[in-house]
A protein has these predicted regions:
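N-terminal helix-rich structural modules
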Residues: 2-159
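Contiguous, non-catalytic segments that form substrate-binding/exosite surfaces or channel walls
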Residues: 132-211
Length: 211
């Protein structure tokens, strides 16, 4: 009789512990969704400002817009890479591996992708993230003027600065890889110069005979 009671007690404790664990994970998922929402809001506002600058915004407002976008990019970077945000994503990632308490395929992918974004962003200082956004915003405004005036000389310095900064960021993200491969992987995950060359050869072998 005592053994049966022990088994029932253990089962009850295990069930209660499982319930507590599930509640803890549910709470973490809600925090994760809230974090995603905050990040998306900042990304959305940055895209709206970028689109505005490329279309109808007054040309003489580029400097102010660049400053505002830089500040917002900094806030986004701080939120993404904060210790609290990183630990939240890591805790959920651990649940997917160890406990299996997260089984929604879409949520699993979102956790994986946001974790990857955090790892890549964390190696870049917030000040550099802000400066990069300001630089590209200013460069876009200069490009519009230079294109109209056929004035490459005024835009060339921005190209040099952008390329230099891209190389620097690639070095921070993955010093062992060629910068070109790092950025190819950013725009198409898993892509490299080698795999892209192989793809182009396949296309060439198929298309050229048809021309």
């Amino acid at each position: 009789m005592g053994k049966k009671l022990d088994k029932k007690a253990k089962a009850a404790v295990a069930k209660a512990a499982k319930g507590v664990k599930a509640a803890k994970v549910d709470k973490a998922v809600k925090k994760f969704r809230k974090l995603e929402g905050k990040l998306w809001t900042r990304e959305y506002l940055l895209k709206i400002a970028e689109f505005d600058g490329a279309t109808i915004a007054p040309a003489n407002g580029a400097a102010a817009r660049a400053d505002a976008m830089g500040t917002l990019a900094g806030e986004h970077h701080k939120l993404l890479t904060s210790e609290k945000s990183v630990e939240l994503v890591r805790s959920l990632a651990r649940e997917t591996v160890a406990g299996g308490h997260v089984d929604d395929p879409q949520l699993l992918d979102e956790i994986r992708v946001l974790g990857r974004d955090q790892r890549e962003a964390s190696v870049i200082p917030t000040e550099e993230a802000e400066a990069w956004t300001r630089l590209t915003c200013e460069a876009d405004a200069v490009w519009h003027k230079a294109k109209t005036a056929n004035d490459w000389a005024s835009f060339e310095p921005y190209v040099d600065r952008i390329v230099a900064q891209l190389k620097h960021q690639a070095e921070l993200m993955d010093p062992k890889r060629d910068p070109y491969d790092v950025w190819l992987d950013q725009y198409e995950r898993g892509l490299s110069a080698e795999s892209f060359d192989a793809f182009c050869e396949e296309v060439k072998a198929t298309v050229v005979p048809l021309v």
